Amino acid sequence: MIWESTALMATVDIAILLVAILALRNLYRHRQRFADSGAMRGLALMAVGLSAMGFFHLADLFTMFVLPQLSSAADAMAAMENLHLNYSWPFILVSVLCLFGGFSITSRRLLLLVGDLTRSRSTLADELTRSE
C-alpha cells in the first residue's frame, strides 16, 4: 500500500528525516553535558545510528525525485527497489544497533551518576543530622 503511493512514501521519508535531524540537533546542543557526564561514546553511537537512518531515507527521496530526472523512470524504479530490498536491511540493522548501544552506554553512565548523587545526598544528610 505505501509502496504504491509516492506521496505517502515521501511523507514517511521526510518525517523520519525530520525526526532524525531534530534528534541530532538535540544531541549536538547538549554535547557538553554529555561530555561532562562521561557519556560521549553513547552520544556518538546515537549520532551514527540517527545519521545512518537519515541517509537511507535521504537516498530514498533521491531515488524518488531526482533519479527519474537523470535517467529513465524504469531505472529509477529499479534503483528504488534495489535500495529497499538490498540496502534497507543493513542500514536498519546499523541504525538500531548504534541507537541501542548509545542508549545503553548513556543510560548506564547516567545511572551511575544518579547513584553517586544519591549516596552523596545520603552522606550529607547523615552529617547534617549528626551535627545538630
Could you say what each language-model-derived stretch is?
Residues 2-127:
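N-terminal membrane insertion elements
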